[in-house]
Amino acid sequence: QVHHQK
């Protein structure tokens, strides 16, 4: 599972 917020 991957969650990225930039």
Curated annotation (Swiss-Prot):
Taxonomic superkingdom: Eukaryota
Function recorded in the entry: Plays a role in attracting adult male S.mansoni to females in vitro.
Protein name, entry field: Male-attracting factor
